[in-house]
Amino acid sequence: MRSLLRWMGVLLLCGLCAAPAQAERIRDLASFAGVRENQLVGYGLVVGLDGTGDQTTQTPFTGQTLINMLSQLGVSIPEGTNMQLRNVAAVMVTAQLPPFARQGQEMDVTVSSMGNADSLRGGTLLMTPLRGVDGNVYAMAQGNLLIGGVGAQQAGSSVQVNHTAAGRIPGGATVEQEVALQLGRADGTLDLYLNESDFTTAQRVVEAINRDFGSPVAAAMDGRLIRLNAPSDSNSRVNFMARIQNLDVTPNQGPAKVIVNSRTGSVVLNREVTLDRAAVAHGNLSVTIDSNPQVSQPNPLGEGETVVVPDADISIQQEGGALQMVNTSADLMDVVNALNALGASPQDLMSILQALKSAGALNAELEII
C-alpha cells in the first residue's frame, strides 16, 4: 500500500501519457522569428509597510535611495541624519514586455525585496522606471502590492505561510516606449522555430503547411528552422501567419527519458521508457543519532557549576537486499509495476535506476536535475 501511495504521482503521469499522441496546433509547437518577449528590470522603493521594512542601519542603500528620492521632490535631509525607518523597503522590480506592446498598455510586474524586510504586505511601490538590456526605459511601474503569503511573530516565536518578501502588481506597469519588431527577413521570407528540435516534427509541419496552401511555401532548413515564403503586404502576412498557427500537426514522440530530481527525490518517466530483464539487489542503509544531554548537578555545599554534558548514541543499520527479478517491460504501466515491486523508496530508486542504466537494462536517457 505504501508503495502505491509513493508512486501516486508517477501513476497520474502515466494516465496522462498513456494515450496516443494527438494533433496539436502549430502555435503550440513553434513560434515565429522576432515574436518574443523582452525582460525589463528596475530598482525602487516600497513604502507604507507596517514596521516590516528594511532595517536601514543594516541596509544603507535603502536610506540612500530614500534621500535621493526626497531630494528630487524638493525635500532636503541634513547631512549625518541617521534615519531609523521600518516602513520602507528597497526592491527589485521585474517584468516581461510582450511583443507588439504599444504605449499606454499595462502589464504585470513582480516586486522582490532586496534588503532584510520581513514582509511587503500592505506596501505601495513608488514610481520605478523599468529598463531593458540596452539601458533604455520602456515602462514605468507603480501601485499596491498583492502578497500571497502571511506571517506573524511575537516574543521570539514566528509563523509564516508562503512567501512574504515578494509580490505582484497586476497591471502595475505602463508601457512608455515600444520595441520595434521586424517580421521576416530582408529577402521576404519568414522563419518559424520549433520549440523542440525534431526532424520528424519539422517534416510534418512542412507537409501540413504546403498541403493547406496547395503550394510549396514552406521548407525545413534543419530540425528546428522552417523557412516560409510569406506575402510582402503586412495585412496579408498577418493572415498568412494566423492561418499557419491554426493548422493541426501530430508531433513526433520524444525520446525515452527518466528525470530524477536529486534534491527532492522526485522521479518522472515518460511513456517511451522500457526495461529489459535484470536482477536487482539493494540494501537500505539507515543512520540513527539519539542525543540525550545529561545535566551534571554539583553538591549544594561544594564549589562547582552546573554543566550540560552531551551524550549521543549513533547506530547504523543496513537491511539485507535479496536479488529480485525485473522482467522485460515494454509498456509504461509495466515499468511502474516492476519498479513498485522492488519496494524501494524514491531515494533508493534513484540509485537503482542509475545502476539499471549502467547495466543496459534501462532503455531511456537518464537526466539528473
UniProtKB/Swiss-Prot annotation:
Q: Would you tell me the Gene Ontology cellular component terms? A: bacterial-type flagellum basal body, distal rod, P ring; outer membrane-bounded periplasmic space
Provide any one GO MF term from the record: structural molecule activity
- A Pfam family matched by this chain, by name? FlgI
Query: Secretion signal: which residues?
Result: 1-23
Domain of life, per UniProt, equals Bacteria
Which BP terms does GO give this entry? bacterial-type flagellum-dependent cell motility
Mind listing the UniProt keywords for this protein, alphabetically? Bacterial flagellum, Periplasm, Signal
| InterPro entries the UniProt entry points to | Flag_FlgI
Q: Where in the cell is it found?
A: Periplasm; Bacterial flagellum basal body
PANTHER family in the cross-refs: FLAGELLAR P-RING PERIPLASMIC PROTEIN FLGI, FLAGELLAR P-RING PROTEIN
Family to which the UniProt record says this protein belongs: Belongs to the FlgI family.
What is the recorded function of this protein according to its Swiss-Prot or TrEMBL entry? Answer: Assembles around the rod to form the L-ring and probably protects the motor/basal body from shearing forces during rotation.
Assembly description? The basal body constitutes a major portion of the flagellar organelle and consists of four rings (L,P,S, and M) mounted on a central rod.
UniProt protein name: Flagellar P-ring protein
Organism the protein comes from: Chromohalobacter salexigens (strain ATCC BAA-138 / DSM 3043 / CIP 106854 / NCIMB 13768 / 1H11)
Tell me the organism's taxonomic lineage.
Bacteria, Pseudomonadati, Pseudomonadota, Gammaproteobacteria, Oceanospirillales
The encoding gene:
flgI
